[in-house]
């Protein structure tokens, strides 16, 4: 039996798809690409935006049209957040949510065996439920491993459907995380990325903390770099920053979730910080890790209900002033079940798209300028994708993309380089 996956959304989704692929392989399936043709087609959905839901439905329709005898599966955040809507998608033979992922295998088998014509198996998340272990030892990227350490979110931001899609915070057992890190190190992975739905919430339900996990992860032999997923700035305290700065393996690249650079919009979004508080946290990280050594990335939503042109300009001024190395810009997507769905002053789609283009152009200028400012600096680069026998792409600790000629080296090596010119996509570099 052949199975193929189509994944939408965040690194957590990508991690879970990899774990599901491993689960199917361990039960006799062969994982193939989307183009090869399969007996089972699985879409792991994202529901952060309406567009994500549309892409899931479109992919299912195409899979069923081109492979009418195959079993099609819709799983993940979309059916969990909108179970009634997802259950009505005729092109999906199996519909499951974001929990109890191990059951997908059984659900698929029921349809394949003719025991059931169709299976809808969406189980609500419940308070007190435990983190679902989905072990994974192999990654599409052979140099960097993504390790899921937490699921769920206890916040209720006005725009966000994720708490509905993922349930409450559930932390993975620390021993389980460390055991996976040891397996990854033994397999040759040198960099790990700790991923989660609400990474700073790790441990609040189990009496530990993210900082403690980072400190213990750094003790695993063979792991040379630890990178963090998205962080909420208000959840980073002074002692956390001090302890993190003492972990030399921790990459000084921080994805600090912003969402807007306008205080009025942040209040409407129900984000628990101001732009001044955000900038203060960033300044403390710069002081702890070194201003020339640290980099910041973030997410920004434009076109939130009630955002005036002045609000947008204020947001853009703050965002560009923060000198982010990378900004993911999203036009606001109205999601049923969120507080903002019922807000007045919803902006037209064309205005949201126009603001998205303006913000993107502004932050790309900053990205180019920040990359250019690094020219001449020394940096360590993890070699990742070989373009030829000697030419590689890779990333610095600050997550700056680099192109370097490295004769005698191989994928997975960490090399010292001098950064050169920015070509619009990456920095050229030379081995020191």
Where in the sequence are the language-model features?
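Short, surface-exposed connector motifs at secondary-structure boundaries
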Residues: 2, 67-68, 220-227
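Proteins enriched for Cys/Gly/acidic motifs involved in redox and nucleic-acid/cofactor modification
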Residues: 1-202, 239, 244, 250, ...
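Radical SAM/AdoMet-radical enzyme domain recognition
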Residues: 186, 211-212, 219-220, 225, ...
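Terminal RNA-binding accessory module
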Residues: 342-432
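Conserved strand-turn element in the central/C-terminal portion of the radical SAM core barrel
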Residues: 160-167, 225-234, 260-270, 291-311, ...
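Hydrophobic, well-ordered secondary-structure elements that form the walls
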Residues: 256, 299, 319, 327, ...
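Conserved glycine-rich "GG(E/T)P / GGGxP" loop and the immediately following alpha-helix
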Residues: 47-52, 189-216, 220, 232-239, ...
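Short, electropositive alpha-helical surface patch
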Residues: 206-218, 238-252, 307-324, 349-354, ...
